[in-house]
Amino acid sequence: MALRFEVGAASQSGGRRGALHLPHGVVQTPFFMPVGTAATVKAVPQDTLEQIGADGAGAEMILANTYHLYLRPGHELIRRMGGVHRFMSWNRPMLTDSGGFQVFSLAKLRKVTPDGVEFRSHLDGSSHFFSPEHSMEVQIALGADVMMAFDECVETPATWERTRDSMGLTHAWAARSKQYFEAHKNEVPWASEQVGESASQRVSDGSLSNRAKFEGKTQSLFGIVQGGMYPDLRRESAERLIEMDFDGYAIGGLAVGEPPEVTREMIARTLEILPRDRPRYVMGVGYPDQIAEYARMGVDMMDCVLPTRAARHGLLFRSAEPGERQAMEDAIGEEQSGEERLGERWTGDSDATPSAIRMNIKRVEYAEDQRPIDPTCACPVCRRYTRAYLRHLFMAREPLGATLNSIHNLAFYLDIMKRVRGELVAANCV
């Protein structure tokens, strides 16, 4: 049995509250996934990930990257360890991408054919080949609860003709991905529970070593809607993938440099077509206000490296206070001058009222600031540490700074999704 998706409360704008049942647990939707590229959410230990957020529930699901784990330490090693959950001692659901986006981002280091993609490792220049079948083989070895069909992410901008051809390749690869998955889905490492128990398996409730937990369960496979920035191609791609009957559907190829209003339009057009009884996943987005907006539109799943990447560069998200909102609105359209005057940057679209601010902890104005990052945030960082201390850690290049910054930003994102879930329940009760 693959995933089971329950849809509960829904709003007039299309947002819905639900629950995604997966082999390693139940995830409340809509939700945001922290990105654990190389089987680690950078700078944040797993036990901390399980507890961050206002309610202490932590991240219910995280993402790992197939391309990076294939190159190092290798999918066969991870298979021998019992899968990526056991390898990294994570007892909650996981998703792996197909590796396609990373391969195609190599540009000069890859060659695309109908069979797949030949590419050179960014680590040592060695030559490799990813086909849909090989991507599935690697993802089955990793053993995440959800895996993605192999796809081509077209460059931006691209002509309609180039985008159509790329989309056709994605559809052909999706069919091949599904065919291989259906034939080999019982080969997932945790299906047999043949790996001996180790310290990394003895998690708090011991459930990773419980053979009955996974009996009759398999991974789930999502198809990825492409079509660039062309609504007609997006529709065609969604309809073609629906015919293939995937467990869920992702909207890919967005947040690659296009204006925010185009991103929103492509998501809205695609959501109109995708089936309501399957989870809907927008890949690689976005800023705090954007993930809240997309969840209210009916997106169930999102991921992005932004909260942790920004944190490592000293950029922290916080709630805008009432007076600041007006000041930020006044600065909209003034571009850099407005940002310099305020020392911060709002994170919404150009026609929206900002509710989240991205602050630069490196600024000298925080050197003696004894306030927390966000007085309204209940994360452990905001409960204990001052802006002055966090600035000191960053300027001194202390590793703890990256950890604390990342914990706060992730908690900020997870709390946004918790609030949206509450809004959807409340809207359904009115």
Region locations from a protein language model:
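Glycine-rich phosphate/ribose-binding loops and adjacent secondary-structure elements
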Residues: 184, 216-222, 226-330, 343-373
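C-terminal extensions of enzymes
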Residues: 1-21, 27-34, 43, 151-157, ...
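Active-site pocket-lining/capping segments in soluble small-molecule metabolic enzymes
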Residues: 90, 95, 100-107, 113-124, ...
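Non-catalytic, usually N-terminal nucleic-acid engagement modules in DNA/RNA processing proteins
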Residues: 1-187, 364
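Conserved, mostly hydrophobic/aromatic
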Residues: 25, 62, 97, 139, ...
